[in-house]
Curated annotation (Swiss-Prot):
Listed transmembrane segments: 3-23, 24-44, 58-78, 91-111, 157-177, 190-210
Native source organism of the sequence: Bacillus subtilis (strain 168)
Membrane topology: Multi-pass membrane protein
Localization: Cell membrane
Source taxonomy: Bacteria, Bacillati, Bacillota, Bacilli, Bacillales
Protein name: Probable amino-acid permease protein YxeN
Signal peptide coordinates: none
Function: Probably part of the ABC transporter complex YxeMNO that could be involved in amino-acid import. May transport S-methylcysteine. Probably responsible for the translocation of the substrate across the membrane.
UniProt xrefs under Pfam families: BPD_transp_1
Quaternary context: The complex is composed of two ATP-binding proteins (YxeO), two transmembrane proteins (YxeN) and a solute-binding protein (YxeM).
Gene behind the chain: yxeN
Record's GO cellular component terms: ATP-binding cassette (ABC) transporter complex; plasma membrane
UniProt similarity note: Belongs to the binding-protein-dependent transport system permease family.
Induction behaviour: More strongly expressed in the presence of methionine than in the presence of sulfate.
Amino acid sequence: MNTIDWEFMISAFPTLIQALPITLFMAIAAMIFAIIGGLILALITKNKIPVLHQLSKLYISFFRGVPTLVQLFLIYYGLPQLFPEMSKMTALTAAIIGLSLKNAAYLAEIFRAALNSVDDGQLEACLSVGMTKFQAYRRIILPQAIRNAIPATGNTFIGLLKETSLAFTLGVMEMFAQGKMYASGNLKYFETYLAVAIVYWVLTIIYSILQDLFERAMSKPYRT
């Protein structure tokens, strides 16, 4: 029976780390756009804006119902067929767009639930003292909703971080693609993919710790 080459596995880490910036850039950029998109969708559905409300529900249903890999292929290979000017779009850009659109749909539901968790009476109270609806949301409603949405939003980011590994199918040289090439060159598949798994695991642990610290900081003003 073959044994695990631990020395080789350890030697794979420096190679994998070289692609870590691409992985993190993809995840962070996609999350920023997803948060913006998700918040807009949540506000539309919360306020039931005519036409936009129906379109947002359709958007959420589509991107939650279609596999992420199919979405990436539709964007990278399909859109240039309909819009030739998009043929210059890079694989990295397509991956960020795809991951942003998909996660915006999930975050929209998270943010909508967070907004609904804030008592409607607070909005009425803000309006009664002369605040505009925009001021009420910015100063009172959104800060509370954001606090309520942090745990689920953090879980979404962890999922997004792992989904960046799908970008290798478009040709993006992120961490999983780097590991795949390294394994093919040395025929040490188990050791290499185990090293890849450990890096992703460590990243999620680090992020979970940071999220926990952030949650505590956000909860401090509400403690009695």
